Amino acid sequence: MLKTNSTYCTLRWGYPIVDFGRGSIRTCCRTFEERVEPEEFEEKGSDIFLNSDYQIKNRLAHLKGYKNKLNSCTTCWRLEDGKIESPRLPEWLPYPYSFKDSDKNMVKEFTDKELTEVTIVNYVTNEELKLKDITLESDILRSQNPFMLEILLSTHCDLKCSYCSPQFSTKWAEEALKFGDVDKGYMDWSKPHIDSEEFEDSFWLWFDDIAIHSLDRIGMVGGEPMIQPNLFSFLDRMMESYNRLDTKKKPILWFVTNLNASEKIIDRFYEYLPKLCEVFQVEVHASIESFGKKAEYIRFGLNWDRFVRNANKLCSYEDKKNFHFGFQIANNSMSITGLLDFIKVAKDLQDTYKRGITLKHNIVTIPEFHSPMILTKDFAKYLDEVVDYLEKLPVNRMLPVPDPLGTWESFLEWITNIRDSIKNQEGEKIDWVSGDVNNIRASFYEWFKKYDERREVNFLEVFPEYKEFYNSCKELCEVKNGII
């Protein structure tokens, strides 16, 4: 179901992401990070993790429909403009609030005048509140009930994925520094502005007092979580909290990993799983969206054979009740033609180990030239093949997975949505930040030309089926730069 034209999203209230490496916090993976400054940290203490001044102001903008003040949310609206399902969650308010039943349709298809008349109900106290009367001091703008938390211990990473950046990968940062894309000032800027030990102490205070009681999901992301030196000590501390506080909950703990780690590291994680599975429902989501040499090009530094070996190792884990394995699929402008072969790998893992394999779907929107929405309609045929393969399985007879958004049925619906949008050239109608779609395509050529030169690879050798598109982008780039 495509989203409505409201600006509301409950993720702003319930989905904090804490970056210990930079001392920053944000809500939702698609928003900008907010560096914690000493003055506000001293004032708010552990309340900084969900109720900073920045977050309070953004929540007010979400409720009031101030789209022009929500710059970090534009990727979702652009997806929706392109007829693609976005991650935005406009359907419900944070506990204990709800839109009044008689106003719910108005919220979905509002006009500015109507929006001010919407009534919100506190269903614990039955107190009613007009949306127009909400101010920065209103309780509804505060959050004490996060439902999902992501942790970045650091951006330490062993890959330079094409659509990543120096912000999330130390390998990327090293390359950017080498070629002058960033300077030493950027590297200094990326360091925490507050004492790291105080930040971590404050986090655990917030986690034990607030977050642990409402969290349903906790994600370890990166960087690359498997190679963080303090991964296991952090997990030990988290398990200690759950055991000590006896919350009676068994939340999901998931890891988003490139699965490129050494056999020694994967073996250690494998041996640690029984301990984790006593406290959590554990999920490992391997980040991948293509196959073989294409996957190695997109995720520069990846060893495909090692990736497959590690996937088989984890799938062999016998506890199918408390441990689940799957893939985090970031559909992008290069993944389309290798997707079918990758899906067949996932199917083989299910058949070999008789366990459900999760297919979590996502889409790259930044940088814009990595979005599949810039592709010409002839690329839809590759997704026709994926859709045909999935429909013939059929997907509703695949082994079950714990996440409704990770089922093969959900993935089929998602990839059909992308296929149709490419086929209908919805990308040409999107209000791109960098200009019209041809400007983005020109940047595609410019960027991958530089990518090939720096990393000593060859785009067209790996993706010969892109030749016509690539040359078209080259011509657009030359026109843009006044060469022709």
Predicted regions and their residues:
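Core AdoMet radical
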Residues: 146-156, 167-199, 213-229, 241-267, ...
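Short cysteine clusters
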Residues: 9, 28-29, 73-76, 157, ...
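N-terminal [4Fe-4S]-dependent radical SAM core
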Residues: 1-15, 43-150, 168-171, 175-185, ...
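Secretory pathway export signals and precursors
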Residues: 5, 24-25, 69-72, 153, ...
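Distinct, well-ordered alpha-helical segments
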Residues: 232-236, 264-274, 338-340
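Radical SAM enzyme [4Fe-4S]-AdoMet core and its adjacent flexible, acidic
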Residues: 1-44, 48-50, 54-55, 68, ...
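Short amphipathic alpha-helix with an adjacent loop that forms part of the alpha/beta core around
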Residues: 203-210, 271
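Alpha-helical packing segments of well-folded alpha/beta enzyme cores
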Residues: 149, 203-206, 234, 307-310, ...
